[in-house]
């Protein structure tokens, strides 16, 4: 084929265009314009890393500042973990105007949820402890009522025994008063002298004491006692005046006597016993005796 016979007039002129060339309104290529490229080549690899670190540092500081602002608006404190997390999310997901507000709001919600969960757990534990205390209180109440019931029963028994003792003493005293009079003892004549005549002298033998009325308390010999012993003797005498059995009083130790008859009760009876005062003191001593029995039962 001859080169002179080829006709290129029908070819599209776009094929002749350069990718970087502009076009006129008639579709023909215009002046070629080249885009600007950064042709600065770092001298070393360290220069390139310094440029990247500089940009990263500035963006991290911006994230921290925005995070501080968002946290301040919602009243929470920014921690290192929050800052590192926000910077990592910024590099991976990007950042817009409300991103950190949502980030701080999410942290606030999570914190509140954890606090509420802990509060609910603490309240449940508190309810369990309250139930345990109620059960223990109920048990203590039952034990106290049982102890009070026993003390009342013992008090009634003691009062009955005191009444029996009083009746026995009164019966014994009545028997002594109603006993027949002592017969006239024989007169023994003693001759003093012939000139003085005879004089009569009556020698009365000693009166026998009923063995049932003898007790260790009444048979104690008189001795020099200390002030503590004299006070204890006064307390024992007060118990006897209150119709306590003498033999039982003799078996009490000084500690028991002081427990039954404290010094204030002895002082109350110092001016004498009226019927009302006697009953009052007797009731207090009975209550002390009940408490003593309860202590002995508990210790055993």
Curated annotation (Swiss-Prot):
Pfam families: LNYV_PP_C. Residues 40-53 have a biased composition (Basic and acidic residues). Its main location: virion. Phosphorylated by host kinases. It is found in: Virion; Host cytoplasm. GO terms for cellular component: host cell cytoplasm; virion component. The keyword Phosphoprotein applies. Homotrimer when phosphorylated. This trimer is stabilized by binding to the L protein. Binds soluble protein N, and ribonucleocapsid. Non catalytic polymerase cofactor and regulatory protein that plays a role in viral transcription and replication. Stabilizes the RNA polymerase L to the N-RNA template and binds the soluble protein N, preventing it from encapsidating non-genomic RNA. This is Phosphoprotein. It comes from Lettuce necrotic yellows virus (isolate 318). The gene is P.
């Amino acid at each position: 084929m001859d080169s002179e016979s080829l006709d290129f007039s029908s070819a599209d002129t776009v094929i002749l265009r350069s990718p970087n060339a502009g076009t006129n309104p008639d579709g023909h290529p215009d002046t070629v314009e080249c885009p600007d490229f950064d042709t600065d080549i770092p001298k070393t690899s360290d220069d390139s890393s310094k440029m990247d670190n500089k940009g990263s540092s500035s963006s991290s500081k911006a994230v921290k500042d925005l995070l501080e602002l968002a946290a301040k608006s919602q009243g929470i404190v920014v921690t290192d973990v929050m800052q590192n997390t926000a910077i990592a999310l910024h590099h991976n997901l990007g950042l817009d105007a409300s991103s950190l507000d949502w980030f701080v709001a999410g942290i606030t919600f999570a914190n509140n949820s954890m606090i509420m969960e802990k509060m609910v757990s603490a309240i449940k534990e508190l309810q369990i402890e309250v139930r345990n205390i109620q059960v223990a209180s109920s048990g203590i109440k039952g034990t106290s009522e049982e102890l009070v019931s026993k003390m009342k029963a013992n008090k009634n028994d003691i009062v009955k025994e005191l009444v029996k003792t009083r009746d026995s003493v009164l019966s014994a005293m009545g028997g002594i008063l109603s006993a027949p009079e002592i017969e006239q003892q024989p007169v023994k004549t003693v001759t003093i002298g012939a000139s003085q005549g005879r004089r009569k002298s009556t020698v009365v033998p000693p009166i026998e004491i009923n063995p049932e009325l003898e007790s260790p308390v009444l048979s104690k010999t008189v001795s020099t006692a200390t002030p503590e012993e004299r006070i204890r003797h006064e307390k024992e005498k007060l118990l006897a005046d209150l119709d306590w059995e003498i033999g039982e009083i003799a078996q009490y130790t000084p500690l028991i006597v002081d427990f039954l008859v404290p010094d204030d009760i002895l002082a109350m009876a110092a001016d004498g016993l009226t019927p009302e005062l006697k009953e009052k003191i007797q009731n207090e001593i009975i209550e002390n005796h009940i408490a003593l029995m309860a202590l002995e039962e508990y210790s055993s």
